[in-house]
Amino acid sequence: MNPYILWLGSIFDQKMVMSSKAISPAANNWQLGLITPLCEKGLKTLVLERGRMVKHIEDYPTMNLDPWDVKYGGRTTQEELKNYNKQKRWGIHEGNRHFYNKDSEYDYDEIKPFDWIRGTQVGGRSLIWGRQTYRWSDDDFEANLRDGIAVDWPVRYKEIAPWYSYVEKFIGVSGEALNLPQLPDSEFLPPMELNCVEKELQSSIAKNYTDRVLTIGRVAHITEGTKNGSGRKACQYRNRCDRGCPYGAYFSSNPS
């Protein structure tokens, strides 16, 4: 009989239990990429989310509103922000605050500065993450050993690289391949285009330096084609990502 895979709590905050043994999962967007092959191989899989249901498109109430149609021009009042005294560090506004926990209801102790940005709902933080997606390099995996601090990583980049590729193909990552040892290339979709000022700066840096590079951010956005069977389509560059994307262009668990 196939074992059951049970995911407890919010998919971006909690732990996976398999055959009664707790396993710490990979963080953020990687988790669905790890669950998917288990499902595809026939394992009976149960995902439990803590919080309200958020259905793709149906529960993105501000996704198509123009700035002048959003209450208070999109700004959140100082009185309302008192409910988000920690979450507001990330970028709360009237177009997206329905995806964030109220600190007045879900507060946490903060002895030292610690930004715990949370969304208690189906999709969790996949609806509010910044989508910047980068591989660690040998420099990162070997840093502790090289600097003589903390604990050496038990794995190296070459061991993780195939799994980076697997997840990147699943979520869709756009970016520019540069063959930089300190920033390994991903399985890229076409990069987003720089604007004219950025292109001028990029050109100037290239002319004057051999050890510096300017490139577009590497983000979990589909920039070309679609993800078959997932309901996800290419980015429309609307700059309304944080309200929920009706095209599913950026990776979240909801359309996937």
Residues covered by each model-derived region:
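N-terminal Rossmann-like FAD-binding beta1-loop-alpha1 element of flavoenzymes
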Residues: 3-12, 19-47
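Glycine-rich FAD pyrophosphate-binding loop
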Residues: 39-61
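Short glycine-/acidic-enriched loop or helix-start segments at secondary-structure transitions
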Residues: 34, 57, 226
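Short coil-to-helix leader/linker segments, especially the first N-terminal amphipathic alpha-helix
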Residues: 1-9, 94-101
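Short, well-ordered alpha-helical packing segments
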Residues: 29-39, 51-52, 117, 161-168
